C-alpha cells in the first residue's frame, strides 16, 4: 500500500531534457508539415534547431511564406509538431522524432551496374534512387526528400533491399535500409551532388540510429496551461483576443483561466490598461466600439496581465499610425526592461533596426542567417536573395560609402535612427576639422 501511495503522491517531476538557465526557448530538429499524408504535402519548417537566449528582443524576418509565423506558433503550443520539439524550461512541446541520418544518401542511377539492375526491375523510368533507414515510412521519406532537395516528389515508393542481394551485398546494410525510387516533375532540373556509385554503395557503412519518439505522450500536453502562462501570444488581428462584453472581462480572461484569483485579475486589468494609455473609464466599455489601435492596446493588456516570461508579437504595427507604431516599439522595449524575452514578426525593417537585439532571417522554412541588425542589413547576399528592403538609415550609409569610403566609420557607430545618423555625421565632420 505504501508503494502505491508513493507512486501517486510522491513522484517528482523530472526535467525531460536538461536545458541551460540562460535559454528562453529551445527549438530542436523542428519540422512542420501540412497535409502530411497527402501527396501535395508542404514542409513549412525544415529541421530548425536554435537556442533563443533570455531577456533579448528577437525580430524574425523573411519573405512571405518563409515559416516565420509557423515557427512562433509552436512556442506556446498553438501548433505541436510530430517531428522535433520546442522546449520552454522543463516543458517540452512536440516529439523527439530524430530525423537526423535517416536519409542516408542518393544512389547514382547513371552508374552502369545500377542501370542494369534498374532495367531488370523495370525501374528505368524513375528519376532518383534514395537510400533511407528502415525507420522511416513513405510519408516521412517524402518529407525528408522535399526538406533536403527543395522539391516535391511526384511519386515515391520503396524497393525492398532485404532480398535484393545484387543491389546491396552487405547483409547488415541490406537488413537495415531501404531504397526509395523517386520521380520529380520532368520539367525540373534537380542536381544532386555526391551520389553513390555501385562500388560506393557496397562500401557504405550503416550505423543504426533508432528514431526516439514520445509523441503519444506529448501530443496532449499535461502542463498546457503552464506553457501558456509562460508564453504570451499577441495576434496580428486583435479581434481574435477580444470576445467579452467589457474590456475588463477581456483583460481578466487570460489570468483567471490560468488560475489567478478574480480580485487579483481585476487589479491587473486596471494596471495594464492604464499602462497602455487607456483610463479606468474604458474598463466597462465594450471592446467592439474601439478603434483599431485601441483594440490592439486592450489585446496586449490582456497578455501582459498574464505576466508571461516570453512575449510573441505577430505583425504588431500592422494598421497603426506612426504614433501607434512608436508606442508599440516602446511596449516591446519596456517588456525587455522587465526581464522578458520578446519575439517580433515584422516586415517593417525600420523597427528591426531601431529595436532588435538579434535578427533571425528565414527562407523556405529554414533559418538562413542570424545576427545583429547591422550584420544582417550589410549582408548583400541576404538582401539580394530575399525581399528584405534595407532601412533608410542603412540606405543612406550605403550611398555615402559609395561616394567616399571614409564614411565606412558610420558602420562602426551603428546609428539606429535618422536622428542618430545625423548626430554621427555631425560628430564625424567635427573630427575632420
UniProtKB/Swiss-Prot annotation:
<dbReference type="InterPro" id="IPR050095">
    <property type="entry name" value="ECF_ABC_transporter_ATP-bd"/>
</dbReference>
<keyword id="KW-0472">Membrane</keyword>
<dbReference type="GO" id="GO:0042626">
    <property type="term" value="F:ATPase-coupled transmembrane transporter activity"/>
</dbReference>
<keyword id="KW-0813">Transport</keyword>
<comment type="similarity">
    <text>Belongs to the ABC transporter superfamily. Energy-coupling factor EcfA family.</text>
</comment>
<dbReference type="GO" id="GO:0005524">
    <property type="term" value="F:ATP binding"/>
</dbReference>
<keyword id="KW-1278">Translocase</keyword>
<feature type="domain" description="ABC transporter">
    <location>
        <begin position="25"/>
        <end position="389"/>
    </location>
</feature>
<keyword id="KW-0547">Nucleotide-binding</keyword>
<dbReference type="InterPro" id="IPR027417">
    <property type="entry name" value="P-loop_NTPase"/>
</dbReference>
<dbReference type="InterPro" id="IPR015856">
    <property type="entry name" value="ABC_transpr_CbiO/EcfA_su"/>
</dbReference>
<dbReference type="GO" id="GO:0043190">
    <property type="term" value="C:ATP-binding cassette (ABC) transporter complex"/>
</dbReference>
<comment type="subunit">
    <text>Forms a stable energy-coupling factor (ECF) transporter complex composed of 2 membrane-embedded substrate-binding proteins (S component), 2 ATP-binding proteins (A component) and 2 transmembrane proteins (T component).</text>
</comment>
<comment type="function">
    <text>ATP-binding (A) component of a common energy-coupling factor (ECF) ABC-transporter complex. Unlike classic ABC transporters this ECF transporter provides the energy necessary to transport a number of different substrates.</text>
</comment>
<dbReference type="InterPro" id="IPR003439">
    <property type="entry name" value="ABC_transporter-like_ATP-bd"/>
</dbReference>
<keyword id="KW-0067">ATP-binding</keyword>
<dbReference type="GO" id="GO:0016887">
    <property type="term" value="F:ATP hydrolysis activity"/>
</dbReference>
<feature type="binding site">
    <location>
        <begin position="62"/>
        <end position="69"/>
    </location>
    <ligand>
        <name>ATP</name>
    </ligand>
</feature>
<dbReference type="InterPro" id="IPR017871">
    <property type="entry name" value="ABC_transporter-like_CS"/>
</dbReference>
<dbReference type="InterPro" id="IPR003593">
    <property type="entry name" value="AAA+_ATPase"/>
</dbReference>
<protein>
    <recommendedName>
        <fullName>Energy-coupling factor transporter ATP-binding protein EcfA2</fullName>
        <ecNumber>7.-.-.-</ecNumber>
    </recommendedName>
</protein>
<dbReference type="Pfam" id="PF00005">
    <property type="entry name" value="ABC_tran"/>
</dbReference>
<keyword id="KW-1003">Cell membrane</keyword>
Amino acid at each position: 500500500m505504501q508503494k502505491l501511495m508513493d507512486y501517486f503522491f510522491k513522484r517528482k517531476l523530472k526535467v525531460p531534457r536538461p536545458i541551460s538557465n540562460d535559454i528562453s526557448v529551445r527549438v530542436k530538429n523542428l519540422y512542420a508539415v501540412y497535409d502530411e499524408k497527402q501527396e501535395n504535402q508542404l514542409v513549412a519548417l525544415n529541421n530548425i534547431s536554435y537556442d533563443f537566449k533570455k531577456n533579448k528582443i528577437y525580430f524574425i524576418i523573411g519573405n512571405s511564406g518563409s515559416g516565420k509565423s509557423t515557427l512562433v506558433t509552436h512556442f506556446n503550443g498553438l501548433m505541436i509538431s510530430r517531428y522535433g520539439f520546442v522546449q520552454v524550461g522543463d516543458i517540452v512541446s512536440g516529439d523527439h522524432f530524430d530525423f537526423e541520418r535517416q536519409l542516408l544518401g542518393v544512389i547514382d542511377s547513371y552508374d552502369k551496374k545500377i542501370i542494369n539492375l534498374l532495367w531488370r526491375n523495370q525501374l528505368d523510368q524513375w528519376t532518383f534512387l534514395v537510400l533511407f533507414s528502415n525507420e522511416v515510412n513513405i510519408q516521412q521519406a517524402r518529407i525528408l526528400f522535399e526538406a533536403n532537395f527543395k522539391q516535391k516528389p511526384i511519386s515515391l515508393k520503396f524497393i525492398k533491399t532485404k532480398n535484393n542481394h545484387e543491389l546491396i551485398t552487405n547483409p547488415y546494410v541490406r537488413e537495415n535500409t531501404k531504397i526509395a525510387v523517386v520521380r520529380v516533375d520532368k520539367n525540373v532540373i534537380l542536381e544532386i551532388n555526391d551520389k553513390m556509385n555501385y562500388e560506393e554503395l557496397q562500401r557504405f557503412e550503416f550505423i543504426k540510429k533508432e528514431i526516439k519518439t514520445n509523441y503519444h505522450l506529448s501530443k496532449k500536453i499535461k502542463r498546457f496551461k503552464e506553457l501558456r502562462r509562460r508564453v504570451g501570444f499577441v495576434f496580428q488581428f486583435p479581434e481574435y483576443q477580444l470576445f467579452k462584453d467589457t474590456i475588463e472581462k477581456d483583460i481578466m480572461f487570460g489570468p483567471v483561466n490560468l488560475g489567478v484569483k478574480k480580485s487579483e485579475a481585476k487589479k491587473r486589468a486596471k494596471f495594464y490598461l492604464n499602462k497602455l494609455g487607456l483610463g479606468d473609464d474604458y474598463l466597462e466599455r465594450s471592446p467592439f466600439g474601439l478603434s483599431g489601435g485601441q483594440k490592439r492596446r486592450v489585446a496586449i493588456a490582456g497578455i501582459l496581465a498574464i505576466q508571461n516570461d516570453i512575449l510573441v508579437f505577430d505583425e504588431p504595427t500592422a494598421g497603426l499610425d506612426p504614433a501607434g507604431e512608436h508606442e508599440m516599439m516602446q511596449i516591446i522595449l519596456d517588456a525587455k526592461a522587465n526581464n522578458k524575452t520578446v519575439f517580433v514578426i515584422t516586415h517593417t525593417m525600420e523597427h528591426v533596426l531601431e529595436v532588435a537585439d538579434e535578427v533571425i532571417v528565414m527562407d523556405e522554412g529554414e533559418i538562413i542567417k542570424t545576427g545583429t541588425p547591422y550584420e544582417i542589413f550589410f549582408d548583400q547576399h541576404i538582401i539580394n536573395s530575399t525581399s528584405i528592403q534595407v532601412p533608410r538609415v542603412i540606405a543612406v550609409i550605403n550611398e555615402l560609402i559609395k561616394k567616399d569610403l571614409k564614411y565606412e566609420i558610420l558602420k562602426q557607430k551603428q546609428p539606429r535612427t535618422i536622428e542618430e545618423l545625423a548626430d554621427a555625421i555631425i560628430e564625424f565632420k567635427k573630427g575632420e576639422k
